[in-house]
Amino acid sequence: MEQYTIKFNQINHKLTDLRSLNIDHLYAYQFEKIALIGGNGTGKTTLLNMIAQKTKPESGTVETNGEIQYFEQLNMDVENDFNTLDGSLMSELHIPMHTTDSMSGGEKAKYKLANVISNYSPILLLDEPTNHLDKIGKDYLNNILKYYYGTLIIVSHDRALIDQIADTIWDIQEDGTIRVFKGNYTQYQNQYEQEQLEQQRKYEQYISEKQRLSQASKAKRNQAQQMAQASSKQKNKSIAPDRLSASKEKGTVEKAAQKQAKHIEKRMEHLEEVEKPQSYHEFNFPQNKIYDIHNNYPIIAQNLTLVKGSQKLLTQVRFQIPYGKNIALVGANGVGKTTLLEAIYHQIEGIDCSPKVQMAYYRQLAYEDMRDVSLLQYLMDETDSSESFSRAILNNLGLNEALERSCNVLSGGERTKLSLAVLFSTKANMLILDEPTNFLDIKTLEALEMFMNKYPGIILFTSHDTRFVKHVSDKKWELTGQSIHDIT
């Protein structure tokens, strides 16, 4: 008999006023590789925290059999302790053996991942492990997880990764229950789409039959009413003997029509109700009017050299940033992408910028700096927007259920959505986005793609999501060998 390592029993846990986790019984088994999926704010991280004993469910119990290693989503704090890590692992992941304070976001993620993987446990929990990781890091993670000997539960919006790793899908539904599917992500998506199509067919059939019966009942009621009116008129007249039988026949027909109408209505009552297929809220980021620039190349770099600590990142580089284009900066962790974005934003020596350029900057770890105020208050304060306008923006992003929640308890995806909403509410004509896709669910990613493709100004961004880069970039600049190469 297969041995379980995790057991949920009668869980009920409130997430927001309108959303909760509701799990009757759920098991994770030894050697099972589970992808936990669901939209931002549906409780994925909360579920992992319950397993790791960091969050206690309001009712119900979570049992675990075995030690747990947990890669947490929002905790990017790392210690300067290289002695506990395998040197070959550090080399394989290209993690520099210097102080963690000077590491990039991607290098910190690799270091933290190496810490978790170096210590084997029979239960491994990974919450968005690919955020900040370059191709080297993702490939390494993929290989490790393929041969991991234990129970794995992974939360990731990296569809390629979970497709290759997972043999079981846990999908958090709108009602807070969890649907379990045996198979990989693509198989689950295909089955789900077929089920939605079949549900739509049954729903349309149900509505059509309901309308047909309703019309038939109405027709019989009308027929009975007309017969009753005809009988009433005849009663007010002197009825000849030869018309008496005709009057009785009308009464009989009227009763028959009434009886048929009641029979049809009973059929309607006993008609098995079919629910409408679940439809998803379409997300939209705010699209403000921006200050236009009549300058083909409003930002120019001449002989730019960038140094971080003792490491030289760029040497005597030149580039021009064209107006109205989306430019992706790509390259391995630690090559200087974030440092270059900061240099451009602060317009350091070597970078000439038109005075008409107005920049807005989304920093890679922006989600760490939010104040302990409600979502609604944060957006109003950061954008000087009215309450009604702020409510409309949050509703468009599917955050209407969390208006009064503190920013400190939001999921990574919810924090990222909020940060981007603040940024996009400005009139900036240049957006600098450092890893904006981290934590975002698929629907929000699509909304971000739509926004970026419509944005009339400059967008300079970084992302390790190759599919996203392909969909939104006009140009690709690769940072390598202390230089920048256009690889569009």
UniProtKB/Swiss-Prot annotation:
Residues that bind ATP 1, according to the entry?
38-45
SUPFAM superfamilies, per this entry?
A: P-loop containing nucleoside triphosphate hydrolases
CDD domains, alphabetized: ABCF_EF-3
Return the annotated region ranges for Q-linker, rich in Glu and hydrophilic AA: 200-298
Pfam families in alphabetical order: ABC_tran
Classification via SMART domains:
AAA, PAS
Residue spans of biased composition, Basic and acidic residues class: 245-255
For this UniProt record, the keywords arranged alphabetically read as follows:
Antibiotic resistance, ATP-binding, Nucleotide-binding, Plasmid, Repeat
What biological-process terms (Gene Ontology) are attached?
response to antibiotic
Region listing for Disordered, in residue ranges: 211-255
**Molecular function as annotated in GO:** ATP binding; ATP hydrolysis activity
Return the Low complexity bias intervals: 222-233
Q: Which domain of life is it from?
A: Bacteria
Q: Where is the ABC transporter domain?
A: 6-199, 299-487
Name the InterPro entries for this protein: AAA+_ATPase, ABC_transporter-like_ATP-bd, ABC_transporter-like_CS, ABCF_EF3_subfamily, P-loop_NTPase, PAS
**Where do the annotations place ATP 2 binding?**
331-338
The UniProt similarity line reads: Belongs to the ABC transporter superfamily.
Describe the function of this protein: Confers resistance to 14-membered ring macrolides (like erythromycin) and to B streptogramins, by acting as an ATP-dependent efflux pump.
Q: What is known of its domains?
A: Composed of two homologous domains.
Q: What is this protein called?
A: Erythromycin resistance ATP-binding protein MsrA
User: Per the UniProt entry, what species is this protein from, by scientific name?
Assistant: Staphylococcus epidermidis
- Upper classification of the organism: Bacteria, Bacillati, Bacillota, Bacilli, Bacillales
